[in-house]
């Protein structure tokens, strides 16, 4: 089997069409690190991951250092066929740094698929190539939020993810306007990004129950580390509670499951450190009947392709993969068709189908 003979990193910056605002950050661009792995047979594999410092702690320069100085000595001269053991050894060298791990994990999967002349989705076992995403609505005034939701509905999205948690009074006031303005055919997801406390979350749920909104989930209402609060809210709520920032890896998933601290887990490759750990989370959740969704950071279309490939292989249908709506279509037209709200992975890709 071929050996890894070179590893390089680079930085890419992708402008957004509009500013993305959550309870924890605001940005008008995507920063990411690209990994290029070279095999001795000439094949190259690419992986990419975002530097979402406010959530994962990763920085661009830190990711490059971890990959080039800590992971590379383990990776170089390794056999591609030993990728699982190689990545395990490399990742044991450093705690956290999940985005750096994601970029490397994806580059290995890209190479594995290219060696077989198939797409990563097919390598992972996907039987189809279409997944539906919601669209995220940034934090803003009630009027701005309503207008942005209307824009999303006009763009054919049927599921709307409303960012909350930055201003609780606005969050409460918003509910009446949503109930007045939108058809019950529109499904809503509310994501507080850790911005509420227990009492605020309960108040929000009680207020929600006064209306007839079609609400699917409430995501990560409180701080990621407050598992007891997540448990109390999950027990209280008649709406499914999703653990997002509370679950990075399989150990985190085991904890929230044991504590009955959620009804669903949001798997993100930038949290899990790539596909291999994401598969472990999904397997664990399946074993106890906890459903999973897939999400993402505000990240590159290449990262969205990787997550969509994983989701399709795992049979996950609840997806929050809308950065495609925030960037220019020509950035991903070689490997994805985005017919809002459907993400369609193109046929006959070799590996992921992207390069940098």
From Swiss-Prot:
Cofactor stoichiometry and binding remark: Binds 1 Mg(2+) ion per subunit.
Amino acids binding Mg(2+): 191, 219, 244
Residues annotated for substrate binding in this entry: 161-163, 268, 320-322
GO aspect biological process, one term: peptide metabolic process
Keyword Magnesium belongs to the record: yes
GO molecular function: L-Ala-D/L-Glu epimerase activity; magnesium ion binding; racemase and epimerase activity
Record keyword Endoplasmic reticulum present: no
Keywords, in A-Z order: Cell wall biogenesis/degradation, Isomerase, Magnesium, Metal-binding
Cofactor(s), by name: Mg(2+)
Extra information: Part of a large, functionally divergent protein family. Protein modeling and substrate docking were used to predict the substrate specificity, prior to biochemical analysis.
Similarity comment: family membership: Belongs to the mandelate racemase/muconate lactonizing enzyme family.
Protein name: L-Ala-D/L-Glu epimerase
Organism placement in taxonomy: Bacteria, Pseudomonadati, Pseudomonadota, Gammaproteobacteria, Thiotrichales
